[in-house]
Amino acid sequence: MRVLSGTSLMLCSLLLLLQALCSPGLAPQSRGHLCRTRPTDLVFVVDSSRSVRPVEFEKVKVFLSQVIESLDVGPNATRVGMVNYASTVKQEFSLRAHVSKAALLQAVRRIQPLSTGTMTGLAIQFAITKAFGDAEGGRSRSPDISKVVIVVTDGRPQDSVQDVSARARASGVELFAIGVGSVDKATLRQIASEPQDEHVDYVESYSVIEKLSRKFQEAFCVVSDLCATGDHDCEQVCISSPGSYTCACHEGFTLNSDGKTCNVCSGGGGSSATDLVFLIDGSKSVRPENFELVKKFISQIVDTLDVSDKLAQVGLVQYSSSVRQEFPLGRFHTKKDIKAAVRNMSYMEKGTMTGAALKYLIDNSFTVSSGARPGAQKVGIVFTDGRSQDYINDAAKKAKDLGFKMFAVGVGNAVEDELREIASEPVAEHYFYTADFKTINQIGKKLQKKICVEEDPCACESLVKFQAKVEGLLQALTRKLEAVSKRLAILENTVV
């Protein structure tokens, strides 16, 4: 490691100070959350037919409660109603029944499944003709009040949904359709409002339905700029997004573990270390012979790394219907050992829960307890060959908000929109696709160039270039100070 002279260190410190004052460069790292919802008449329409087991219905109730928790509930804010259906329709509570969040949550806990058939069309008809009526607490149509129905179902309806859903949408009701398990996906599309990619959701089982609650929390949120309102704790920079915010630091500073305050970075360390985790799709559609090609792809990337305790560490996670850590960061200290562990990885088969894998990456793989190093660059490579069976948007966004560099690699039936959702900015440089597993080695070559050790922003390796940059910044700062002095002189003369 190069040792900086006293003069260089002084200049480096000065540059960092100037960058803090003048540079627009940001490194988003941490998010806060605060949400205020617009007035809404919201009716849940929930399938409790025989195919929904009691334990699964309890999962639905957890999902409903999580969405309700995020709302501003009140007579002049958001009102919530609940329609339960099977062969018949039962209104569990009307829009006017409960005016507090606590009362709503208690009412949800008391709901019991009905069993028997699946009359989804009848339930939607009840919602638009009865549940939104004046007598039940529905408010008059107004641009200031949203009318929303969220339908949750796990099967094929025994009646038609297309016409009644079209009438609901035409009357100004926004329809969301959530399908679980063996649901008829064409039915979901017939129910939902446009754009359908924002109004149709599918999960493989009720055990993961609560993952969708965050989506609806954000969908109902109308606060657009928490930074402008001052509802944040960021020390240097606040970046606003609907209902939330991201704390960041000026160039030359790093975000502390509290996600709010910043420290000047120190020379000779930081991003020269890389923690790299592979998230590998081991679903049934990959097939055993192609899974062996995926292993070679991983080893191809590993061969390009400087594996050591101080430079690159590698972790590996495989996912299908569940998530399995093959080995954590730091377990193996040589390329040879890493590649041997990759060769020994067994194929999981089953489903494609990419969202769950991304959440595992955030909650486990990049934690200190799993071998991640504070200050090391965090890189995730997600490899998949098909559409995810769970919701990926929240976890994908959070990974990027936390500063992880995310690459998305798709093969065959992989969905481009999902790859783009996962990939870091600029997206074109962080997502790759090929139609055939036999050509993934070409993607490996491209990735090798992308996964490089970033230059330490505090290292000042090129002193000539560095000094020129300092001089330029000093001149700019001098001009700004002169302009400020002139303004102060004018103000002083005005006062006198």
Curated annotation (Swiss-Prot):
Changing residue 344 to A: Abolishes N-glycosylation; no effect on protein secretion and increases interaction with type 2 collagens. Homotrimer. Part of a complex composed of MATN1 (via VWFA1 domain), type 2 collagens and type 6 collagens. Forms a complex (via covalent bonds) with ACAN; the interaction increases in abundance with increasing age of the organism via an increase in occupancy of MATN1 binding sites. Interacts with COMP. Residues 467-495 form a coiled coil. The gene is MATN1. PANTHER family: CARTILAGE MATRIX PROTEIN, COLLAGEN ALPHA. It comes from the Eukaryota. Residues 23-222, 264-453 form the VWFA domain. This is Matrilin-1. It holds the Pfam family FXa_inhibition. Disulfide bonds join 227-238, 234-247, 249-262. It is found in: Secreted, Extracellular space, Extracellular matrix. Glycans are attached at residues 76, 344. InterPro entries: ECM_Assembly_Org (IPR050525), EGF-like_Ca-bd_dom (IPR001881), EGF-like_dom (IPR000742), Matrilin_cc_sf (IPR036337), Matrilin_coiled-coil_trimer (IPR019466), VWF_A (IPR002035), vWFA_dom_sf (IPR036465). GO terms for cellular component: collagen-containing extracellular matrix; extracellular matrix; extracellular region; matrilin complex. Residues 223-263 form the EGF-like domain. Residues 1-22 form the signal peptide. Its main location: secreted. Keywords: Coiled coil, Disulfide bond, EGF-like domain, Extracellular matrix, Glycoprotein, Repeat, Secreted, Signal.
